[in-house]
């Protein structure tokens, strides 16, 4: 029965690819078929193998490794992304795309093959070397427009314009400022070849490839079945299944929109059938899928950049991310449960759920994740080598079941998919490097720091609030990776200088860069969910924002209670913060939902909301008042409902 349901859902939403193309720019790829497809996939697979080589074995000059990596990205990028997503012909690539591909890739390969001579001459450049740098940057920006969108180009363009003004006018260099910018942004490791693309080449790329292998191993289907077994029969089961499965699948896919479409094609129809409103069903899936990027052990690409910015082992980043991620999904789970009780919804009949025993027999599919966590946590190997070993383990465990077996043909597909998935992330890293370079070399980062201090009057909460607004606005058009790089360069240092621990400050900007995917007006994950649910897009986005209210609260808890991210704490303190935060989340969820055991009047909603928020503020007094308010409203509702039933 369960397999039939999955098949029916897949048939009903066989236009999932169309939805991905509409809401996810990374999915707007060229259409290759037959022999051309085989050739392009072979190029993508070859690039994936080279990316793995760079991460696992390469011992070469950084400039050589990075320029060869970016050169390959430009080649496979232009083979993958068309100039206009609305005019894509099968097996067609216009001549000008070939020109851009060859010139852009050639510019970086020129640097690669002449790296030693160029580095020795820097900052002096010959005119033709300046021209090569300009060509390479133009090709990179055009690929950025195709793969990640216009907004990040605009942001980078504004910062580059300021950098030109800074050197050309303020420093009096005139047109010589062009050479200065090309030198610093193209040839020196303070721009394109900076921290973001270095992290991408070292370990982000191989983790993306590992994710492609995991997806092809059948682990997503296992996660959905596992979620059904855990929560399917409970009140409002399908929505809880969506939360659990999206959290698990999201940490593999790394894409809010992609996860919404793939798991939502199964879970959203189930939620609607149970009785949830379409806009709520789409919102649940979008909110849960967006949280996949903060779910350890495989988080979004920005989490890997955090390793570079903080100089902290990835295992520590993962460990510190566990409690905030748990609170995020607890908040969504509570909201879903209260909505189910409000609508008197039942769960999925046990006869329609997957049998437990066959499902448990597939638990071996988790082995690659377990091995990865073990390798990373014990620091036995580098992150890249840990991911490489996990890929080998994935191939090995896939042999246990015929339908999941990674044959040579499927391994080829995994490599091609992994290579394709690297393009948009790598391009975003390159452009983020340009932005970060402009910020640091002009001193603009310090000016932004001074401006935030002035506007906030050195008040921590106001500084946090303005940082949150900047992250969300930037995240509406800029990929999470680039958003994090910009905010980590500009706003995170401000928060750190105001006394917030570095890891808490970086998690703060990381979280708010992600929630832009469900925050109106540009809430792409929510809009993808609404398309599947056939609901009003704006209502779906507003519901998703309400469901993910934890994402707007947890970062503040981290800033005010660093124990949430395991900074200068002990076990007792952590337990206390977790308990008070969960109870506080319950209070806020009940206030937003307006229902506990019966409808909650407005005054009591305000009281329980205030109590919930107070419990998230560190301090014995605030916890005491919060418990009194939340507990009082809870007791009043409980005994009131009992009296009503007795009557």
Residue ranges of predicted features:
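Membrane-interfacial loop-to-helix junctions in multi-pass transporters
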Residues: 127-131, 190-203, 229-243, 274-280, ...
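Hydrophobic transmembrane alpha-helices that form the pore/transport pathway of multi-pass ion
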Residues: 224-292, 298, 302-305, 311, ...
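Conserved, well-structured core domains of diverse proteins
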Residues: 1-120, 130-134
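Membrane-water interface regions at transmembrane-helix termini and the short interhelical loops
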Residues: 29, 54-59, 81-91, 117-118, ...
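Core transmembrane alpha-helical segments of multi-pass membrane transporters/permeases
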Residues: 142, 146-147, 155-171, 178-179, ...
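Hydrophobic or amphipathic alpha-helical targeting/insertion segments
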Residues: 95-98, 104-108, 113-117, 124-125, ...
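Long, contiguous bundles of hydrophobic transmembrane helices that form the permeation core
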Residues: 2-38, 319-421, 524-613, 641-646
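Transmembrane alpha-helix interface/packing and boundary motifs in multi-pass membrane proteins
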Residues: 211-215, 246-255, 287-293, 436, ...
